[in-house]
Amino acid sequence: MENYQSLSDHDLKILYEEAKETMDEYEQLQLVVKLNMNSLYGVSATIGYSLVDYDIAEDITGSARHYAVLVDIAINKFFTTWANDPENLEKVKKFVPNAIALANFKNYKRDSLDDLCIYGDTDSRYIDVYRIYTSLILVDDGNGNPVNMTFPPNTPEGNHEIAEFGVQLEKYFIAEIIANSIHNDIAKRGANDGYLKMALETISRKCVYQKKKKYIMSLIYKDGKVFDKPKLKLQGVEIKRGELSNKMKSIIQVLINKLILEDFTIDQIRGEIVKLFKYIKVKKDKSMIYRATSVSMKDIYKNDKGEWVSNKTHIQVKIAASWCNFIERNNLTDQYQRPFNGQKMNYYYDVTGNVIGVPDDVDMTTVPGLPEPDWNKMIKQTLVKPIMRYLFDENDFDDKDIDNFIMGIKKIEL
């Protein structure tokens, strides 16, 4: 490689193809190792496999959580005092040339809004780059006065700037914090060093975190590559799960794109929801507003009146019983069958408050005589409430909260 400058264009192309092939092979090998290790971890905690060993699974989970939390605390503590060391400013100037001062991260409180590590799992931590960018680095305003930096605009150039900032922040600060905190803890325990690794994987422009394993973010960087256009990463949210109709999930996807990728304001999203609310009520398409779940037939029986009933009160039993009674009352048993135990069923609430269930292999728009849905209730449940979870820090909203949001009435904090 030392003599590459003397190579001909032809030889350089050959060298490039060989290097590319080697990198592809290495990345595939990495993927195989990762999949194998994840599989071993998974089967160690699953009773159906011969390799099950709960002690091993607990050790792996506990160790990962321990070091993730350790790194979380170390990162926060570093930024609470980083302005006190002049060397840190010199490092920052390497990627923010007009920086003239640093500010310490004040009021750090673990697992609160005043925590730079805003989300995490057993093997990861998500750092608030926005806060570091806009409040912990001061630049020259042109007259020698220190001012906070303005976050780059939502443009390809702005996203590249954010991604580069995140990469440099990791290079000059975060990587060292992670390495030192892990090394010191391992040394303290007398364990073997060199087997734990943490690295920068993704950088996101905008994120919404709901709770454990439920989040959505706009990726602008992943595994060493900056994207020309942000890509959504979704984990555990409604549009990834089967509890809503495909039509409603598509509608929510459009609204999420506007919120996360196009920086729509809350009022703009509310305006879109109001228009959709009116449209769905006019269209009266049942296949848009149902929810879905698996049902149980084990505890359902016919009473003396010939009605399907159950001593259980959970929703899955009610859904199954409603369909059994509906097809018998309407003489439709020759066209439709009773659900089997564990079957997926779609359901909605009608105008009388009763739950109405239809097996997922039946098109509910073609079933004759189905009761009229409570359109207001179902649109709130399947459209408004899921979107509100992305807009606000809370996860639970009652009917009054939803009505106030639709009408644009802001909650007054007392």
Regions found by a protein language model. Give the residues of each.
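Active-site-adjacent bridging/hinge elements
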Residues: 2-14, 35-49
